[in-house]
Amino acid sequence: MKIIFMSPKKACLSILYALFTNTRKNEWIGPRVFDVWGLPTKRILKAYKLRLYPTVEQQARIDHTLDCCRFVFNHMLDRQQKIYTRRGEHMSAYDMQKVLTRMKNYLPWLRDADSKALKYACCQVEDAYKHFFKKQCGFPHFKKKRQCAASYTTTKGTSIHIEQRQVKLPLLGWIEARGGKIPDGVIKRATIQRSATGKYYASILM
């Protein structure tokens, strides 16, 4: 075993670097959160809500992705119910995403929607079943077309950018936005919502 001696100052800097960086990707991830025993815990994520003012074309793209996500969710939920009734099994999110890829061959209009949002809809079906089996909620139900409010989540954080009074979202490009000041940080995902009154919002998770 090789022993390395270093000055106290260099040792402190090495410890801080280990705490504030991702050792696998060598990325700066910010301070970690520690519990009462001084042990590192999961980082706390926070969502920031923005009011969106999309153009007519951007509204059409948002509405199309909302419709596609609802269709995928209902289709996968229907498959889950049939598989569980026949064999007592259920599909994983990965299995549903493979089915989704095949669906795009005979349902080409799915290709015009946000692909990450469609995959996330499959994850939502899996999560709904997990919560049901853990008795945390009721049995999953189908989403209605005429729901008062609708939303979808895009998970490609590297394609989401925020500047003064505008936000860039996958498939939509730059959209005029209003809201509170959002600090710099790593963006995980964004949830785009259409309210019952026809207003559009984006919830940015960091």
Where are these predicted regions, by residue range?
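Nucleic-acid substrate recognition interfaces
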Residues: 2-206
